[in-house]
Amino acid sequence: MKFENIKGSIVAMITPFHEDGSVNFEVLTELLERQIAAGTDGILTLGTTGEYPTMSHEEDASVVEHTIKVVNGRVPVMVGSGSNCTATQLEKSIQYQDMGADALLLISPYYNKANPEGMYRHFAETADAVHIPCLLYNVPGRTGCSISVPVVEKLAKHPNIVGIKEASGDMSYAMKIAHCIGPDFALYSGNDDITIPLMSIGGSGVISVYANVMPGMCHQIVADYLGGNQAQAVANHLKYLKLMNDLFIEVNPIPVKSAMNMMGLNVGPMRLPLCEMSEEHQAVLRASLQEAGLL
């Protein structure tokens, strides 16, 4: 399915594991079917929430292959192919494109970082090498570097770079991006708690962690807001805002996987260095799930 600058809720999928740490493909199938049945508008696999940094390249490819096979064109599948090594990013991007991905999510180069020209070329050379749409991923809290507004503005002119997942949480930055991009460049919230503020400045929706827990509601909030029923969207957003925030009470994806296990979805453990939540935070999260009617 073509990725046509989707307006809606794209779930940032978790990767379920068995207790021995191997990928649980049976549960992954169940989770994908649950998302599609709930109306999710798109699937992102191998994002931050999918724990790709702790998986081998072979495991990454097996998750991509399985996801594309199960989804079977019912909604677009975006794959995180980013790396802090441009050559590695190129290799993965071409591989996932050839496997049938509909779009690619490219993170800014973490740890080694880059100057503005290096940042531009990191994304542009990858976009030059593939024919499926590419989205930028700005998450400076993880990478230690932000994609500057001038670099985003320049990259937005590339015919194969179609949007950005903005996960800095900085509304001033987001507004500057919204001001400099054209109507064909999509701005997605990468933070569930500010999805509505971003849509109010022209955002296309959210790439969501919360959608792992409440996929139908996440889809409905975005659909209502973009469809003109802003009052209902805001009411539901505020109703579940505490849960959205508590899904980040510890580093993602620890809370969301913990929540899904509490809900009986059997997604298994995280891989080290991620580990179980503190008892105090488990109690807070359980209370939020109960308040939301999920337990």
Locate predicted features:
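Active-site beta->alpha loop and helix N-cap motifs at the rims of alpha/beta catalytic domains
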Residues: 2-11, 17-146
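C-terminal alpha-helical cap/extension of soluble enzyme domains
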Residues: 5-16, 38-40, 49, 200-203, ...
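Short, amphipathic alpha-helical "lid/cap" segments that border enzyme active or binding sites
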Residues: 25, 32, 149, 282-289
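A general structural signal for well-ordered alpha-helical segments in protein cores
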Residues: 28, 60, 64, 89, ...
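Alpha-helical structural signal in soluble globular domains
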Residues: 38, 62, 66-70, 95, ...
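Short secondary-structure transition/capping segments
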Residues: 55-58, 91, 116-119, 147-149, ...
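Catalytic alpha/beta core domains of metabolic enzymes, predominantly
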Residues: 128, 142-248
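Glycine-rich phosphate-binding "P-loop"
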Residues: 138, 160-161, 271-272
